[in-house]
Amino acid sequence: GVAGTGKTLLALAGALEQRNKFDQIILARPIVALSNRDLGFLPGDAEEKVNPYMQPLWDNLKFIQSQFGENERKHRIIDELKEQDKITICPLAYIRGRSLSNVIFIIDEAQNLTPHEVKTIITRAGENCKIILTGDVRQIDTPYLDEQSNGLSYVIDRLRGKDLYCHVTLEKGERSELANLANQHL
């Protein structure tokens, strides 16, 4: 779906709703800056380096949290899940060799991945693993990918009609009228 349709928000809300069926919710995004213009070296450990790229995921979790009063259990659950590493981030650079069982794995901005990278990610799925790819093929920041050659389009094309696969396209922008105007005219 286009920018502002709620792709990431709905993936996170769905994962939180199903959290009791899984041991962990893992969040990831490709480390690709807007227009592939990086800020350069970032200090810190792996988590500190990827946190700026993960901020949209944290922003969406914060938005979900804001829908409940601070004293409500649903508000506190997100903080508790993060503290217990039940919601965690995973740099995609370290995914090879892992076997992900009993997890929901959300990969945001999957249009910035290559078909090979998407295959590598999906083949990490162990038993009781749900993988959710979100993205918009019109928002590609990786210079050598386009609407047809990116990993998200590849998955949609290759897995359409398979039993373990589902694809949803969100069409109505919900972020703001300005975001909708930009989607339609820019």
Where do the PLM segments sit?
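Walker B catalytic carboxylates
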Residues: 108
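Conserved helicase motor core of SF1/SF2 NTP-dependent helicases
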Residues: 1-104, 112-186
